[in-house]
Amino acid sequence: MKTIDANIILRFLTNDLPNQADRVASLLRKLEEQSETAFLPDLILADIIWVLEGYYKQPRAQIRDWMTSILSLPGLEFSNKEIALTALDIYVETKIDWSDAFTASQMLACGIIEIFSFDHHFDKIKGITRIEP
C-alpha cells in the first residue's frame, strides 16, 4: 500500500494542471477497481480541505461532495471513514472550521458529549455541550 499526498487529490479536483489531473484520474480508476490501494492520512485530508476552501475558494458543500466521493473509493483506506463523513456534514451544516468539525465527529463517535472550549461554535453541534473552564 502507498500513501496519497494532498497534491494528488488537489490536481484531480481542480484540474489546474490537466496533464497531472489526467494521470490522477487513472490512479483513481485503479482505486475504484481496487487494482491499486492507497492510504489517505487524516492530516492530508485536512490539508486538502484547507486548500480547497482557502486557496481555491470552493464552497463547503462542493468540498463535501468531492471528498465524499474520494473517501468512497473502495481502494482508498482512511483511518475512519465514518468519522470523516460525519465531520464533512458538520463542516457544511454548522460552518465551523474543519479541525473542529473533525474533533466533534470523533467526540460523538466515542460517546464524548462535553468539550472544554471557549469556541462558541461548538454550541451549534447537536449532542455536544461546551464547557468553559
Residue spans for each PLM region:
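Active-site neighborhoods of divalent-metal-dependent phosphate/nucleic-acid chemistry enzymes
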Residues: 75-115
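Short, well-structured N-terminal submotif of metal-dependent ribonuclease cores
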Residues: 1-40, 55-62, 68
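Acidic, PIN/NYN-like endoribonuclease modules and their adjacent C-terminal/linker elements
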Residues: 1, 104-105, 109-133
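Structured helix-beta-strand junction loops
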Residues: 34-35, 73, 94, 125
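Histidine- and aromatic-rich ligand-binding microenvironments
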Residues: 5, 40-41, 96-97, 119, ...
